[in-house]
Amino acid sequence: MSTENAHLQKEDIVIESWLHKKGEHIRNWRPRYFILFRDGTLLGFRSKPKEDQPLPEPLNNFMIRDAATVCLDKPRPNMFIVRCLQWTTVIERTFYADSADFRQMWIEAIQAVSSHNRLKENAGNTSMQEEDTNGNPSGESDVNMDATSTRSDNDFESTVMNIDEPEEVPRKNTVTMDDFDFLKVLGQGTFGKVILCREKSSDKLYAIKIIRKEMVVDRSEVAHTLTENRVLYACVHPFLTLLKYSFQAQYHICFVMEFANGGELFTHLQRCKTFSEARTRFYGSEIILALGYLHHRNIVYRDMKLENLLLDRDGHIKITDFGLCKEEIKYGDKTSTFCGTPEYLAPEVIEDIDYDRSVDWWGVGVVMYEMMCGRLPFSAKENGKLFELITTCDLKFPNRLSPEAVTLLSGLLERVPAKRLGAGPDDAREVSRAEFFKDVDWEATLRKEVEPPFKPNVMSETDTSFFDREFTSMPVQLTPPRRGEELPTVDEEEELQANFIQFASYYVSGSLERSYDTNRSADKYEIR
């Protein structure tokens, strides 16, 4: 069991039995063996734990405090909903029991535990949280970079990256939004905007991602925001977007990053319809190196899609948006959170099966299929139909694709995770061995010595022509923190800020052009 639940003892069990839980994303019913403990911990398992052994890793991990229960008998008999306040948001989980008696037993147990813990805790700290259960999403990453460097005849196997770790410079809280001039909107999402800005003191251009704290809390995305901050700071690689600053304002979280003014790869593919196999091979090789680096640091990316692949002004890949990353997942480890973009989800994620880092290689298969075929491998207007296609439909390829390309895509888009290309312990190296990549010079690719097949025609450093005009034509302004004229009360303000106590502000010294030095012996990293 994970360390966060190591304190749980079997004598603290209040109730345990089989229940059916309704999925939060795919709204089907799933049997789980649930155990409720005195401290409010509610664990769900795919099978009943053995009595003579320690509890295994749970599939579901809830914390129920100050909870309310509601009984329902439609659309199924013996249903009940557990509601709990997480800061300003009511979180609901829906269950049904096999009988009315079992339902009543669970409701009484939940109410008893809730009443007991309500007396012990401040109501402002009550929550009901469901997390991934393998790893610690709120803990600091503890990554071993002491990989032994070995060389072989395989060019990819001997690719060594000597990465300069970013230097965290102690400084006072002097970085604020007032330090930047906002120029153009580059993108907008549910949680905020990405804006092209110029730092007043250095006159340098950056892309600043500004996230509304209120939206992060309302959507229960605090943990993902903290993860993005840690990953951005910890990871330095030529094909990952690099962080310059991260800080928080009163109502916003801000990430100041390098500006990749070549725009989204999605935009370029829309204009070209398809990419040649050679161009796809170039982008694919840079993506593979970047994902191999993340996996070596025990990070699963989980959000591979064309919209998250940018080009710099020279035409090299920059992967962006690390909010869905999962830390502390090494080879053999699995996690279970349903997350990602529907069209890019691996079958095991859709089917609610614990998954490993090979979900990233499925995502690579989807984006490379799009590049060469000009369309998604599976598409439908309704998610239900889309998920059915992803999990059951055979792949189809245009006749013009080479046998090497078909073999590569078939391997990456293998539905059985254990058989998927890249699923073994060799990870990225296994993908690199595909015949499709036989002519790739991996060391030269890493050093950016391979000429990109396409260089964006960027007219100036502030040219945003490769970004969606829907966004670049927007006025540069931030969304007010609250709807209406009402100002937050002191309690509400403290409640909001308490969510971000663990958010560390970072300042990376030096130029963002730094990333690796092939002559350094320190910090060697080998994709193995």
Curated annotation (Swiss-Prot):
UniProt xrefs under InterPro entries: AGC-kinase_C, Kinase-like_dom_sf, PH-like_dom_sf, PH_domain, PH_PKB, Pkinase_C, Prot_kinase_dom, Protein_kinase_ATP_BS
Protein name: Serine/threonine-protein kinase akt-2
Entry keyword annotation includes Transcription: no
Annotated function: Acts downstream of PI3 kinase age-1 and kinase pdk-1 in the daf-2/insulin receptor-like transduction pathway. Essential role in regulating developmental arrest at the dauer stage. Phosphorylates Forkhead-related daf-16 and the longevity-promoting skn-1 transcription factors, which inhibits their entry into the nucleus and antagonizes their functions. Role in immune function and pathogen resistance. Downstream of age-1 and together with akt-1 and sgk-1, promotes cell survival during embryonic development.
The protein's Enzyme Commission number: 2.7.11.1
UniProt binding sites for ATP: 186-194, 209
Named cofactor requirement(s): Mg(2+)
EC primary class: transferase
